[in-house]
């Protein structure tokens, strides 16, 4: 299997790529796009734009992940209405976003992105608080590709 190859050949570049954990390559800290439920659409767009990932996590007052907003969500909202001035993050977010643990292999993250047709996964801890994000482009840059 792919996992066996990575374990047997850890020194080679292929082995390194195959054995990379999400924790080793995820975007962390201040670079994670995050807004709270009451954030205005204007500030949400600014957060998505400034972090350059095409998405943002939405958290509640305790810091728990409650949703995600993507560029696509914003486009779909604008297709419905141009009256967006008073809309908050909680009103436009997708609830129950796809998440992943930092302990998984990066190759598994790629499989999940392909399975759900998404470009990023939020890395959460055991209490569902965001601790990172992983983007498809980062996986491709590492040389990971689908089977």
Language-model segment annotations:
Residues 1-10, 53, 65-79, 118-119, ...:
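Short beta->alpha transition motifs characteristic of CBS
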Residues 3-26:
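Cyclic nucleotide-binding regulatory module and flanking cytosolic helices
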Residues 11, 30-38:
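Short, surface-exposed loop/turn motifs that are enriched in glycine and acidic residues
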Residues 20-32, 86-97:
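Bateman (tandem CBS) regulatory domains
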Residues 31-33, 55-57, 66-68, 90-91, ...:
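Structural motif
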Residues 35-52, 59, 78, 99-118, ...:
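The conserved cystathionine-beta-synthase
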Residues 43-92, 103:
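Phosphate-binding active sites in nucleotide-utilizing proteins
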